């Protein structure tokens, strides 16, 4: 048989839900929002009872259920509203029957008001504990009709010590006044013991009278004021910082300094006697002088001079001048409006942006050469004198020409294609004095020139043989093979003259080197260039004493028309066969090899699309055509080669010095795999191109890397602390 009733647990007995002052005030707010609550259905206009939502068992009751529709004017709405507090029996066993009847009628009234049914305990423990507590019987008195007051008074006679308190509370509730609930401290929960409503809400006498008036009316529900306390327990118990006070004037502080602090009791007493209060106010006005109202513009509106306001002023207090905003302490008459200053700043920024844009778009060169062009050391490579025959040669080519003094290159003599290398040392032993005398220029003032130790020509021949070369070219066209023999004989005689002149160059070279060694250390590069000094090793290029290794961009001017060169008979056979081959592979091989210094290069990051015509045609300078045959160096004194044999350029043996130490002879008896030789007059079109072809690709690449390293170091040093 299932258990139909279960007693209250220990938790439910010890921790009962007590009706708090806050919950009661919340319930009263419902009545304030809905004034028609509690009226009869006929007063509300309802003519039929509501239908049930679902079929369920409805307990049968006596016809006394109609009492729920009766309205008792003396009972307030708060008496009808039930509390969810479970009632424990607190009366003795002798009065249990009477309480049963009261509870039964109370349940009937609760069903109409849709209030949940309260549980009731029949356990002995709850009876024993609740026998001494009559205060908890308030929940019953809240909902009992007026005709049940007799039974309630009869039950309170048993405990006479609580009669007066109970009657007073009952009368206050019947009148509709708020009653402070009283609880048993032993039954309160831990939360209720710690957080108790310290003070009850004091109701004004006028409000109490208004409540009584509304309670006596039959149809009008009582008016409930806003009894909800909008202050939480946290705000009441844990006070924060005091609110920031508004700034006051000194006059106000002086006037309020003598004001006495009045307690709430005294203040209430003064309010009760308005006549006495008015008299005191009149006396105070007579004694105190009238306060002068200062103009509104001179009053401070509570502005606090904070750190933010001191540091971050409005833009109107700044002046834009010289690209920066400066604070203006005083009013300047010609400062101008704020919009004008903003406009000046925006205009300046836009001008800078346009300048940067034009600076990038207006310069179309390889970015690898930027540091070379802007180098301050370019002045060290200027030509000291332009009185020589090479005055038309650009300074860029002179600076980049690493040949130096042609007499110094003993191992760089050109090998003929048919005979061994017998003329090498003889050419170097020729004096140079005749050359300088013919030109009429002193040796120290001669700029850097291209003197080919391996060539059959000298600089004197370039000046003196120019008309003869043109005449001989015309003779070749007219007479053909008949003139070929004469040219060979004449070339052989000129070759012997060159050998004699080169001996003097060698002697001068030794004197120059001895002078530099006596002074201690190597002479600066510009000084060596003026003296016609030698380039001993690659260190002379990469680590000069003065100026640094400077690589500049090619000249922007159009080079002069190509000179007519003398065509050798042995070159005619090579001209047609290898000319097409060079043009086909010029573009492909130039991209694989490192570019020589001074030769035009393709921009890796072009600003505009480069056409095929812009691709440098000087790439042929670095193009080899055939491998270099290795020839042993011959001792001096051997017979020179025939004059009709053509000379070729050997880029693999470009940087050689007079020092015979093997440490400095890096390229002796070495031949690069892709070093092919070109006819000298066929590979280039003008003087600059001719001289550019004689610049070593290997030395140019090494010097370029060295200069790039130097440029990066300088840039890192300059930008270490940021660009100012």
Swiss-Prot record:
<feature type="compositionally biased region" description="Basic and acidic residues">
    <location>
        <begin position="480"/>
        <end position="511"/>
    </location>
</feature>
<feature type="modified residue" description="Phosphoserine">
    <location>
        <position position="314"/>
    </location>
</feature>
<dbReference type="Pfam" id="PF15501">
    <property type="entry name" value="MDM1"/>
</dbReference>
<keyword id="KW-0597">Phosphoprotein</keyword>
<keyword id="KW-0175">Coiled coil</keyword>
<dbReference type="GO" id="GO:0005634">
    <property type="term" value="C:nucleus"/>
</dbReference>
<dbReference type="GO" id="GO:0005814">
    <property type="term" value="C:centriole"/>
</dbReference>
<feature type="modified residue" description="Phosphoserine">
    <location>
        <position position="594"/>
    </location>
</feature>
<comment type="similarity">
    <text>Belongs to the MDM1 family.</text>
</comment>
<feature type="modified residue" description="Phosphoserine">
    <location>
        <position position="263"/>
    </location>
</feature>
<feature type="coiled-coil region">
    <location>
        <begin position="340"/>
        <end position="364"/>
    </location>
</feature>
<keyword id="KW-0539">Nucleus</keyword>
<dbReference type="GO" id="GO:0005813">
    <property type="term" value="C:centrosome"/>
</dbReference>
<feature type="modified residue" description="Phosphoserine">
    <location>
        <position position="242"/>
    </location>
</feature>
<feature type="compositionally biased region" description="Polar residues">
    <location>
        <begin position="138"/>
        <end position="147"/>
    </location>
</feature>
<feature type="modified residue" description="Phosphoserine">
    <location>
        <position position="658"/>
    </location>
</feature>
<dbReference type="GO" id="GO:0005737">
    <property type="term" value="C:cytoplasm"/>
</dbReference>
<feature type="region of interest" description="Disordered">
    <location>
        <begin position="626"/>
        <end position="647"/>
    </location>
</feature>
<dbReference type="GO" id="GO:0060041">
    <property type="term" value="P:retina development in camera-type eye"/>
</dbReference>
<feature type="compositionally biased region" description="Basic and acidic residues">
    <location>
        <begin position="93"/>
        <end position="111"/>
    </location>
</feature>
<feature type="compositionally biased region" description="Pro residues">
    <location>
        <begin position="632"/>
        <end position="645"/>
    </location>
</feature>
<keyword id="KW-0206">Cytoskeleton</keyword>
<keyword id="KW-0963">Cytoplasm</keyword>
<feature type="modified residue" description="Phosphoserine">
    <location>
        <position position="123"/>
    </location>
</feature>
<dbReference type="GO" id="GO:0005874">
    <property type="term" value="C:microtubule"/>
</dbReference>
<feature type="short sequence motif" description="ST]-E-Y-X(3)-F motif 2; required for efficient microtubule binding and stabilization">
    <location>
        <begin position="189"/>
        <end position="195"/>
    </location>
</feature>
<comment type="function">
    <text>Microtubule-binding protein that negatively regulates centriole duplication. Binds to and stabilizes microtubules.</text>
</comment>
<dbReference type="GO" id="GO:0008017">
    <property type="term" value="F:microtubule binding"/>
</dbReference>
<dbReference type="GO" id="GO:0046600">
    <property type="term" value="P:negative regulation of centriole replication"/>
</dbReference>
<keyword id="KW-0493">Microtubule</keyword>
<feature type="modified residue" description="Phosphoserine">
    <location>
        <position position="126"/>
    </location>
</feature>
<feature type="region of interest" description="Disordered">
    <location>
        <begin position="401"/>
        <end position="573"/>
    </location>
</feature>
<protein>
    <recommendedName>
        <fullName>Nuclear protein MDM1</fullName>
    </recommendedName>
</protein>
<feature type="short sequence motif" description="ST]-E-Y-X(3)-F motif 3; required for efficient microtubule binding">
    <location>
        <begin position="232"/>
        <end position="238"/>
    </location>
</feature>
<feature type="short sequence motif" description="ST]-E-Y-X(3)-F motif 1; required for efficient microtubule binding and stabilization">
    <location>
        <begin position="9"/>
        <end position="15"/>
    </location>
</feature>
<feature type="region of interest" description="Disordered">
    <location>
        <begin position="79"/>
        <end position="152"/>
    </location>
</feature>
<feature type="short sequence motif" description="ST]-E-Y-X(3)-F motif 4; required for efficient microtubule binding and stabilization">
    <location>
        <begin position="306"/>
        <end position="312"/>
    </location>
</feature>
<dbReference type="InterPro" id="IPR029136">
    <property type="entry name" value="MDM1"/>
</dbReference>
<feature type="modified residue" description="Phosphoserine">
    <location>
        <position position="83"/>
    </location>
</feature>
<keyword id="KW-0677">Repeat</keyword>
<feature type="modified residue" description="Phosphoserine">
    <location>
        <position position="570"/>
    </location>
</feature>
């Amino acid at each position: 048989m299932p258990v139909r009733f279960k007693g209250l647990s220990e938790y439910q007995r010890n921790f009962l839900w007590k009706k708090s002052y806050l919950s009661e005030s919340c319930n009263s707010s419902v009545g304030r929002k809905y004034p028609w609550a509690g009226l009869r259905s006929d007063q509300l206009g309802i003519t039929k009872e509501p239908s049930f939502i679902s079929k369920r068992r409805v307990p049968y009751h006596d016809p006394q259920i109609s009492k729920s529709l009766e309205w008792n004017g003396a009972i307030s709405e708060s008496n009808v509203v039930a509390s969810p507090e479970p009632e424990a029996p607190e009366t003795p066993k002798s009065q249990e029957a009477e309480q049963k009847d009261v509870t039964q009628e109370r349940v009937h009234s609760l069903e109409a008001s849709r209030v949940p049914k309260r549980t009731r305990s029949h356990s002995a423990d709850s009876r024993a504990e609740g026998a001494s507590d009559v205060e908890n019987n308030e929940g019953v008195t809240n909902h009992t009709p007026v005709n049940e007051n007799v039974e309630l008074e009869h039950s309170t006679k048993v405990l006479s010590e609580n009669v007066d308190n109970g009657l007073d509370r009952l009368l206050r509730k019947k009148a509709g006044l708020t009653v402070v609930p009283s609880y048993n401290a032993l039954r309160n929960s831990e939360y209720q013991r710690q957080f108790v409503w310290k003070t009850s809400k004091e109701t004004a006498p006028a409000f109490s009278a208004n409540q009584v008036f509304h309670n006596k009316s039959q149809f009008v529900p009582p008016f409930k004021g806003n009894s909800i306390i909008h202050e939480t327990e946290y705000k009441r118990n844990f006070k924060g910082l005091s609110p920031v006070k508004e700034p006051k004037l000194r006059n106000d502080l002086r006037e309020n300094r003598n004001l006495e602090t009045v307690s709430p009791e005294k203040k209430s007493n003064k309010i009760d006697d308005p006549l006495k209060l008015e008299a005191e106010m009149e006396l105070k006005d007579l004694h105190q002088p009238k306060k002068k109202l200062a103009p509104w513009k001179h009053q401070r509106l509570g502005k606090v001079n904070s750190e933010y306001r001191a540091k971050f002023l409005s833009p109107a207090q700044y002046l834009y001048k010289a690209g920066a905003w400066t604070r203006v302490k005083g009013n300047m008459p010609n400062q101008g409006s704020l919009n004008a200053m903003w406009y000046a700043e925006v205009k300046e920024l836009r001008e800078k942006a346009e300048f940067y844009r034009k600076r990038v778009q207006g310069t179309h060169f390889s970015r690898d050469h930027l540091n070379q062009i802007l180098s301050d050391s370019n002045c060290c490579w200027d030509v000291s004198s332009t009185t020589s025959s090479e005055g038309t040669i650009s300074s860029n080519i002179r600076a980049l020409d690493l040949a130096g003094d042609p007499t110094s290159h003993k191992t760089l003599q050109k090998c003929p294609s048919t005979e061994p290398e017998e003329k090498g040392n003889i050419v170097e032993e020729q004096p140079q004095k005749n050359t300088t005398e013919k030109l009429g220029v002193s040796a120290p003032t001669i700029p850097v020139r291209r003197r080919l130790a391996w060539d059959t020509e000298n600089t004197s021949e370039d000046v003196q043989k120019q008309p003869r070369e043109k005449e001989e070219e015309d003779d070749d066209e007219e007479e053909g093979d008949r003139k070929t023999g004469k040219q060979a004989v004449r070339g052989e005689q000129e070759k012997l003259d060159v050998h004699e002149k080169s001996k003097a160059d060698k002697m001068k070279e030794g004197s120059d080197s001895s002078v530099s060694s006596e002074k201690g250390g190597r002479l600066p590069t510009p000084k060596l260039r003026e003296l016609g000094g030698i380039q001993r090793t690659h260190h002379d290029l990469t680590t000069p004493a003065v100026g640094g290794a400077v690589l500049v961009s090619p000249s922007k001017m159009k080079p002069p028309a190509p000179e007519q060169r003398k065509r050798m008979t042995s070159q005619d056979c090579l001209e047609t066969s290898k000319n097409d081959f060079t043009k086909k592979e010029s573009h492909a091989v130039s991209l694989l090899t490192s570019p020589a210094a001074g030769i035009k290069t393709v921009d890796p990051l072009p600003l505009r699309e480069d056409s095929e015509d812009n691709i440098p045609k000087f790439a042929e300078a670095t193009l080899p055509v055939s491998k270099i045959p290795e020839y042993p160096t011959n001792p001096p004194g051997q017979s020179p080669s025939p004059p009709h044999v053509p000379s070729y350029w050997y880029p693999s043996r470009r940087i050689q010095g007079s020092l015979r130490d093997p440490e400095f002879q890096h390229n002796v008896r070495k031949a690069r795999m892709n070093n092919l030789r070109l006819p000298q007059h066929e590979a280039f079109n003008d003087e600059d191109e001719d001289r550019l072809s004689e610049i070593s690709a290997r030395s140019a690449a090494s010097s370029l890397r060295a200069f790039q390293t130097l440029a990066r170091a300088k840039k890192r040093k300059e930008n270490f602390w940021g660009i100012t």
